[in-house]
Design a protein with these regions (language model features):
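Alpha-helical transmembrane segments of compact multi-pass small-molecule transporters, enriched
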Residues: 39-45, 98-112, 191-195, 230, ...
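Juxtamembrane helix-loop boundary signature in multi-pass membrane transporters
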Residues: 1-8, 104-163, 270-291
Length: 291
């Protein structure tokens, strides 16, 4: 398989992840779902670390890097928990675009904290375009009472997922020096796993984890496998191809999510949302090309 093909297949699996996950949380509690899914993802994370040959370097990681790995893992865990809560309440074609705002937040924070001002005009325009596109995709429904409160709840969780994802990226950049990226991902996933199951236990939901519907369990496992497969293919594409191109292709996962949400849940895009989606794709592509 060529690296370009691997990048496209990686984007495909990344896109279907959210749809598969939503199929697995119709009855299953989102906290329980996150914990179960993380078990599957952890296997792939360490497989990637093994393939890259970086596991042997774990003993040379500095204490400061360990601290930031743990903090980044906690932020990642919080992002995943918020994301799955949002998916359980809101539509895929609304939750995914808001979650992608993490790229905007990370870019803006990097400009302020790290002085990443190369191609500053493009970065500012790109972030503005993505923000506008996201706003267009979040269409307010004319509802009242519980339905209106539900609309606000999914948005709050989706924004939380974006903020924590951006924080995880910044923490990784600040403190994780000299740690191979795949090994760092594996270690952070361990932190996420501990955090996810700790939350399940603290909320008294361990019993629910034992009695998860088999049908939904299959979808949760499939979601984890899709994420892991996407990671492996993306790693292969980056290792054998051009990183800048792979990153651009990966951004197309949002299109896959929207298309499959239409097929699986009949989530239709209005003209306004379609324009918003196009703007998000253009904005993310611009940020990827002109770093």
């Amino acid at each position: 398989m060529s690296w370009v093909a691997a990048a496209f297949v990686s984007a495909f699996f990344a896109g279907v992840t959210s749809v598969l996950a939503k199929c697995g949380i119709k009855q299953t509690d989102s906290d329980v779902a996150t914990a179960i899914r993380t078990c599957v993802v952890l296997v792939f994370a360490w497989a990637m670390a093994g393939i890259s040959g970086s596991i042997g370097t774990i003993g040379s990681i500095e204490p400061r890097s360990w601290l930031f790995l743990v903090l980044s893992g906690l932020a990642t865990g919080a992002s995943w928990i918020c994301y799955f809560k949002a998916l359980g309440i809101g539509d895929v074609n609304k939750v995914v675009p808001v979650d992608k705002m993490s790229a905007v937040l990370a870019a803006l924070i990097a400009i302020v904290l790290f002085g990443e001002t190369s191609n500053l005009a493009v970065k500012l325009v790109g972030t503005a375009v993505i923000t506008l596109g996201t706003f267009l995709m979040i269409e307010k429904k004319q509802s009242a009472g519980p339905e209106r409160q539900q609309d606000r709840t999914w948005l709050a969780y989706a924004l939380g997922a974006a903020v924590f994802a951006a924080l995880a990226s910044i923490l990784a950049k600040v403190g994780i020096e000299g740690v191979e990226s795949n090994l760092a991902t594996a270690i952070r996933t361990c932190v996420v796993l501990v955090m996810a199951w700790a939350i399940v236990a603290a909320k008294g939901k361990m019993g629910q984890a034992v009695h998860v519907d088999r049908y939904e369990l299959v979808f949760l496992a499939a979601s984890g496998i899709a994420t892991g497969t996407s990671w492996l293919l993306c790693y292969y594409a980056i290792a054998t191809g051009q990183v800048s191109v792979v990153v651009q292709i990966d951004k197309l996962s949002i299109v896959v999510s929207v298309l499959f949400a239409r097929l699986a849940f009949n989530e239709k895009l209005s003209r306004r949302s379609a324009i918003g989606l196009a703007l998000i794709v253009l904005g993310t592509a611009a940020l990827a090309v002109w770093k």
